[in-house]
Amino acid sequence: TIIDWSKPARELHNLVRGLTPTPGAATIIKGKRIKIQETRVDNDNNGSNYLTGEITAIKKSIVAVQTGKGFLLIHRVQLEGKKTMDIGSFMNGFTLDIGDRFGN
């Protein structure tokens, strides 16, 4: 199932929980397909300056993504053909920047 970033963060969080581990909730970033494996919700609605699917913050253990309502905080992902890993380990081999958009 492909993630529709225009949906509210709570709905996307529940989608990820319901589809993990299989079949998985997937998205595209920089031409690569990844499954989102673990998330949290931040209902702060002050993200109107961001596009849906846009990375708004990057920290060692999370990547925050603007959704249709609130932010989805990504903790664990699985790059196609690889093992599930925490977002920090993922970023050791895959560069993400604020402003990058999931779904593209």
What is the predicted function of each stretch?
Residues T1-I3:
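Flexible, acidic loop-helix segments that line cofactor/substrate-binding pockets
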Residues W5-N104:
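An anion-binding loop in the catalytic cleft
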